[in-house]
A protein has these predicted regions:
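Extended assembly/interaction regions that build large supramolecular complexes
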Residues: 1-409
Length: 409
């Protein structure tokens, strides 16, 4: 009863003059045998001095959707629109899903008083029997993970939505930017209402570009932010992701998450980085540092903390960590020295327990010879969940000489 289908997705650039074909997806049915089917198509258009843009169309047995992005060259007005229609059958229930998105950008901003900012465009979205695609499990807040990984920073991208009965969404937003400034800053923000729930979301993506003549480089930053108020569940989630760099000097990544449950006063947390996704900075390919600070009203479970720290930790708890490393030389050549140090700790109050792990590691690599030494210190003071007391300090010091074919430790 299983059909035999062969599908090929081609990406190319066939220039036909005004029109450029960019993509085509063809499906062939062998059992039962059927004619070829075009299931996806993308093309661009460029009429000099008049119009340029691109669009795509996808279709299958139950859904057809596409987007188009055009710029009217004489007036420099950009218009982007997307439409999707789906026939949905879920557990015997049938419905027709519709999603529509629209975005308009102007060449000249509408000034916002004396703020130095202006409105460069507007955007909107309507979705009936459509919902946001579920992002894969990650360390980020779900709505922020969707905005970053699925929607690629654009909430009105209909490719980030999928058909689902009894879900609705309404969104309006604007595009803001600087006016007459050497620092280029633009922000795309959307206020979205989702049903059932109701659920109110504020999603923002901001880009920053500043030219630094003295450093002969540029400072670039991308900021993603989500405020998710789920009135049905009684929760508030705030997520922030910052990527900032000054090439070739500095790279910084900062994740932040806050969560509050209005039905349970102990169910809250504030994460300035997490052990599994830390605040990270790199300077000149020489210094590498990361760290985190986690506060939780309900403690921590397995997977939340560094290796060597006890879990679970109940009640209000704090966990923090800092890790740094320096590299001199070239790892690609095989001649370098590296020093690394770090500490991870957790403090719980129900019952009281303080545990910390400190390590120091050094390596000298000279082509085929590798000299390494490391030390580790663990401190554990307080009371275990079973009521037994603990007060211990333990350490370990090791060294190793590694040659091309053997090592001594």
């Amino acid at each position: 009863n299983n059909p035999l289908i062969f599908e090929i997705d081609l990406g190319f650039a066939v220039d036909l003059g005004v029109v450029t074909i960019e993509r085509a997806r063809v499906r062939l049915r062998f059992d039962p045998l059927g004619p070829p089917e075009l299931t996806a198509f993308a093309a661009g258009i460029d009429i000099p001095g008049a119009l340029r843009g691109r669009g795509y169309l996808e279709m299958n047995e139950s859904e057809i959707k596409g987007q188009i992005d055009l710029t009217i060259v004489p007036v420099q007005v950009r218009i982007a629109a997307g439409v999707g229609v789906a026939n949905i059958n879920e557990n015997g229930r049938k419905a027709t899903g519709v999603i529509v998105s629209l975005e308009v950008e102007f060449p000249v901003a509408i000034p916002l008083g004396n703020s130095g900012l202006g409105i460069y465009g507007f955007l909107g979205l309507f979705a009936m029997h459509y919902s946001r695609k579920e992002p894969p499990p990650s360390a980020m807040a779900p709505a922020l993970a969707w905005l970053k990984d699925i929607a690629q920073g654009n909430p009105t991208d209909i490719a980030a939505w999928s058909p689902k009965i009894d879900t609705w969404a309404f969104g309006v937003g604007a595009v803001l930017g600087t006016m007459g400034s050497s620092v280029i800053f633009n922000l795309k923000g959307v206020v979205m209402l989702e049903l059932p729930g109701p659920r109110l979301l504020l999603m923002m993506r901001a880009n920053l570009l500043a030219v630094l003549p003295k450093l002969k480089g540029t400072a670039e930053g991308t900021f993603l932010a989500v405020i998710d108020l789920d009135m049905g569940r009684g929760t508030l989630t705030i997520g922030l992701s910052v990527e900032f760099g000054i090439q070739p000097l500095l790279e910084i990544h900062i994740p932040v998450e806050a969560f509050f449950n209005f039905h349970d006063s102990k169910d809250w947390h504030l994460y300035l980085g997490r052990f599994i996704e830390q605040i990270h900075a790199k300077i000149l390919e020489v210094f590498d540092g990361s760290g985190y600070l986690m506060l939780s009203g309900k403690g921590f479970a397995a997977g939340d903390l560094a290796d060597g720290l006890p879990v679970p930790v109940n009640g209000f708890a704090i966990s923090t960590g800092l890790h740094v490393s320096f590299v001199w030389g070239s790892k690609s050549v095989g001649l370098y020295a590296e020093v690394a140090a770090g500490v991870d700790a957790v403090l719980g109050f129900d019952p009281f327990r303080l545990t910390g792990v400190l390590y120091l590691r050094g390596t000298l690599h000279v082509f085929i010879i590798d000299l390494s030494a490391w030390a580790k210190l663990t401190v554990d003071i307080g009371e275990k969940p079973d009521g037994s007391k603990v007060a211990s300090i333990s350490g370990q010091i090791c060294g190793r000489v590694k040659f091309l074919f053997f090592s001594i430790e």
